[in-house]
Curated annotation (Swiss-Prot):
Provenance organism: Sus scrofa
Residues engaged in binding Ca(2+) 1: 26, 31
Gene Ontology CC: one annotated term: cytoplasm
Modified-residue entries (N-acetylalanine), positions: 3
Entry keywords, A to Z: Acetylation, Calcium, Metal-binding, Phosphoprotein, Repeat, Vitamin D
In-chain residues carrying the UniProt-annotated modification Phosphoserine: 42
The protein's name: Protein S100-G
Binding residues annotated for Ca(2+) 2, in chain numbering: 58, 60, 62, 64, 69
């Protein structure tokens, strides 16, 4: 997936993965892993781990990633 998607496309992709388990408006760590592996496969190559990325994105510390928190990742990728 290119980070150059419209906001509606990004929201749709987020919701597709978030709806797999638990809260359909939040990504669990497993859902985030599935999304990254399918949509951003090169993101976790190198020293960065899923745990590092999840901790960085989960700004409020609730153990899930909201769409707003996910947008931080998209912005970083598109730079």
């Amino acid at each position: 997936m290119s980070a150059q998607k419209s906001p509606a496309e990004l929201k749709s992709i987020f919701e597709k993965y978030a709806a797999k388990e638990g809260d359909p408006n939040q990504l669990s760590k497993e859902e985030l892993k599935q999304l990254i592996q399918a949509e951003f496969p090169s993101l976790l190559k190198g020293p960065r781990t899923l745990d590092d990325l999840f901790q960085e994105l989960d700004k409020n510390g609730d153990g899930e990633v909201s769409f707003e928190e996910f947008q931080v990742l998209v912005k970083k990728i598109s730079q």
